[in-house]
Curated annotation (Swiss-Prot):
A matching Pfam family: N6_Mtase
Reactions this protein catalyses: a 2'-deoxyadenosine in DNA + S-adenosyl-L-methionine = an N(6)-methyl-2'-deoxyadenosine in DNA + S-adenosyl-L-homocysteine + H(+)
Subunit field text: The type I restriction/modification system is composed of three polypeptides R, M and S.
Keywords attached to this entry: DNA-binding, Methyltransferase, Restriction system, S-adenosyl-L-methionine, Transferase
Family note: Belongs to the N(4)/N(6)-methyltransferase family.
Note: Type I restriction and modification enzymes are complex, multifunctional systems which require ATP, S-adenosyl methionine and Mg(2+) as cofactors and, in addition to their endonucleolytic and methylase activities, are potent DNA-dependent ATPases.
Function: The subtype gamma methyltransferase (M) subunit of a type I restriction enzyme. In the presence of the R subunit the complex can also act as an endonuclease, binding to the same target sequence but cutting the DNA some distance from this site. Whether the DNA is cut or modified depends on the methylation state of the target sequence. When the target site is unmodified, the DNA is cut.
Signal peptide: none
Protein's name according to its UniProt entry: Type I restriction enzyme MjaVIII methylase subunit
Organism: Methanocaldococcus jannaschii (strain ATCC 43067 / DSM 2661 / JAL-1 / JCM 10045 / NBRC 100440)
């Protein structure tokens, strides 16, 4: 609709009404209560908005003389092509709108719904050109197979964004219907919708925020946005809210750490990649990306939190990953690894080629009695049970059991040197020559923990020249300051490449990495603390003696000046006392 001829004061009235009523109908009396402080002639305001196409008015059924009003969404021309920067800008606006009032997952839901709607409609247009003889319903059925089912064959109704965005009730019904039509792929999404409180947001004091979000997304066309752009936007949203959610206990692995692990475990075509603590799926997605363009790779994840597991599914979809090749199971992997039967269907052994994970650090409550709930505890936890204060080495054993080739695990650095039961398990891993490398990461990489983490690389197929040895990489200085979050650090592409290069070359580099014989580790009582074997070289600072002298001379003169001032004050005070 054209807004050029609408006076700013009437647009202000539009915003006031939108904030108060959203898309819900209201009467003249209701509008007057909201506008009377700013406008003398409310009737004129409503007429101007109606003339501009910003307000819809209909007669009451019981009394034709009285009108019912309803705000029309303020839309502009669609963005023809959404670049990554434009999409991130849109999401930043959305993030500013919701702040702490609305669950950030609503933003992810809207991104998902709008993106698949636009992609679906683009596919419909492509299919119409390809199959000119087919009627529209048959085209919709074909599109259902290509994207997700958004057309209800029985009800003969299409559930896409632009069909329902102007009606709150239809909007919620559409989301629920999409879940119903895609039960296997989107199982759990209905629960996510409930947990975000989205159905009630249209009815409470935050409804204007939700309506503004709908208007915001309605202005963008995602149909030609690549899945890389959409996936990056989804990841950006998770990353943007990570500092806040970390305070509430949610864990998010920085994407750079996931990239580094991909460079270390090197996922390839025709492999099954497992993450038994997959969170929102970011670690698995980075393995997929590393393997090339549209790789023939199967991603398998398990996540204890049901809502987070749904976020992983949406993440896969927006990255263009077919959910036939990406499965997420819900449950506690340490006690009930549900993924095994699926992996067995794919490759027979029930074990993955590569395993990657950032399991909860120092997770308590997983002692011998608890872990024996797992039917395969004798095989999985064959090296022993950790104490109840930290499940780190329970996770390492689980991952080792389900790994055929190589694994990359992010852990708290304390797992490398703590004693007791953990040391007993660690000793077995060292003696059996399962550990290929240990990488000490910089501090302040993780949102919920300032301490440095480590990456443990397990390799069941060590090359002959690496057998009986472990590579220690001290990457504690390999970081840049985080560009968006104060007090945090970040791995740059150069940092990642340097660490990956050191791992591939597997040789000593002064102050950075060292290849250590297992015998030396035994002498150190199986302590794997990276700093014990390699420390960064402290660079000598160049000192300009002339500059130092000038600075000292300056400070000395300032001292003398202030001394004379203070001395004068003291003499004055002394004179007054006498």
């Amino acid at each position: 609709m054209k807004l050029r001829n609408v006076e700013p004061r009437f647009l202000k009235a539009y915003n006031i009404l939108m904030d108060k009523f959203g898309l819900f109908p209201f009467t003249y009396d209701m509008a007057e209560k909201v506008l009377k402080d700013n406008y003398e002639n409310v009737n004129e305001v409503l007429s101007k908005l109606a003339d501009a196409g910003l307000l819809e008015k209909t007669a009451k059924k019981e009394d034709k003389r009285k009108k019912i009003y309803k705000i029309k969404p303020l839309t502009t021309e669609k963005i023809e092509k959404v670049s990554k920067d434009k999409l991130i800008g849109l999401l930043k606006q959305g993030a500013d709108l919701i702040r702490t009032q609305v669950d950030y997952k609503v933003l992810l839901l809207f991104l998902f719904f709008k993106a698949i709607s636009d992609k679906y409609l683009l596919k419909v247009e492509e299919l119409k050109k390809e199959f000119e003889d087919l009627d529209e319903e048959d085209i919709y059925v074909l599109a259902n197979e290509e994207i997700l089912e958004l057309y209800d064959v029985e009800g003969k109704k299409l559930y896409v964004w632009h069909e329902v965005a102007n009606n709150p009730e239809d909007f919620i019904n559409a989301l629920n219907k999409i879940v119903e039509m895609n039960k296997e792929k989107l199982s759990g999404l209905d629960e996510l919708i409930k947990r975000t409180g989205l159905p009630t947001l249209f009815e409470n004091e935050n409804r204007h925020i939700v309506q503004h979000l709908i208007n915001l997304f309605s202005r963008a066309d995602f149909s030609e946005a690549s899945y890389d752009i959409l996936g990056d936007a989804y990841e950006w949203t998770l990353n943007y809210f990570a500092p806040t959610k970390a305070k509430e206990g949610e864990v998010y692995t920085p994407i750079e750490v996931s990239k580094l692990i991909a460079h270390l475990v090197e996922p390839k075509d025709d492999e099954v990649i497992l993450d038994p603590a997959c969170g929102s799926g970011s670690m698995l997605i980075e393995q997929y990306r590393f393997a090339g363009s549209n790789p023939n790779i199967v991603l398998v994840g398990q996540e204890r939190n049901d809502v987070t597991a749904v976020l992983a599914k949406l993440n896969f979809i927006l990255h263009g990953i077919n959910l036939k090749d990406a499965k997420v199971f819900i449950g506690d992997s340490l006690l009930n690894p549900k993924f095994e039967s699926f992996i067995x269907e794919v490759k027979g052994t029930g074990k993955a080629d590569k395993v990657v994970a950032n399991p909860p650090w120092n997770q308590d409550g997983y002692d011998e009695n608890t872990l024996k709930v797992n039917e395969k505890y004798k095989d999985i936890y064959m090296y022993g049970f950790p104490n109840k204060n930290s499940a780190d080495w329970a996770w390492v054993q689980l991952i080792n059991y389900y790994t055929e080739k190589k694994a990359g695990i992010v852990l708290d650095s304390g797992a490398l040197f703590r004693g007791g039961k953990e040391k007993t398990i660690r000793k077995r891993f060292v003696d059996d020559d399962l550990i290929e490398a240990v990488v000490l990461l910089p501090e302040k990489l993780f949102y919920n923990c300032p301490a440095p983490g480590i990456i443990l690389i397990l390799n069941k197929n060590k090359p002959e020249e690496r057998k009986g040895k472990i590579l220690f990489i001290n990457a504690s200085n390999e970081y840049i300051k985080h560009p968006e979050v104060k007090k945090l650090n970040k791995l740059s592409d150069e940092n990642i490449e340097k660490i990956a290069k050191a791992y591939k070359e597997f040789k000593d580099v002064d102050g950075f990495c060292k290849v250590v014989d297992i015998e030396e580790i035994r002498k150190n009582d199986y302590n794997l603390n990276v700093s014990l074997y390699i420390s960064p070289i402290e660079e000598d600072e160049d000192v300009d003696l002339g500059e130092v002298y000038e600075e000292l001379n300056k400070l000395h003169n300032e001292y003398l000046e202030k001394f004379e001032v203070v001395k004068g004050y003291l003499e004055e005070i002394n004179g007054l006392i006498k």
